[in-house]
Amino acid sequence: KAELQERGIQVYEKGHPDILKREDYAFIVKNPGIKYTVPFVNYFVQHQVKIVTEVEIGYRYASHFHYGAITGTNGKTTITTMLYEMLQRKGNAIVAGNIGFPLSALAYDFEEEEKYVALELSNFQLLGIETFAPEVSVVCNLAPDHLDYMPSVEAYYESKMRIYENCQKEDWFLRNVDDPTVVAYAKNIPCTTIDFSLTRQDVDLYRKDGKVWLV
């Protein structure tokens, strides 16, 4: 709080005063855990004021980083940690997002540096992206979750697929073909798709004889 005030930023606590309800904001940065149905937030939804999450702001200032972005219902923290350990061998690796550091903090601390970021993302964070485009992304699996926040299970699944919506052909999306829900919802993928499986070998990436093979 004190640091924000030192920078001339007004801080309001214990409520949302009506004086903040304006329609001329360029955008609003929302804590991803706050529902869009909360009256104060919903005011801006109804007036079509752009609402983004911290990940989007961090990316705007650090789009030069190299991102491996992971989301899914279960296992994403484990996968993110494993990716970080692999990237560490190259050096300049950081883990961020739902674990590790906030992306905006990294953008501030390493504005001029090249970093390889293992980034764990929740669907709450993905709901508030606009330009975020990782070089590599994966939805590791899908199962019903967060139905106290999302209007439907379909909306929850669709929010996960936002992870690749801004990607280009040269980017990669890793698709888990062992998960029928991922296959059903991973559509209109704008980047190069790498299908992987633990049970099949007619895919791009598979396991055989204790090794991982990329065709």
Question: What do the predicted segments below correspond to?
Answer:
Residues 22, 26, 31, 151-154, ...:
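Adenine nucleotide phosphate-binding catalytic loops in nucleotide-utilizing enzymes
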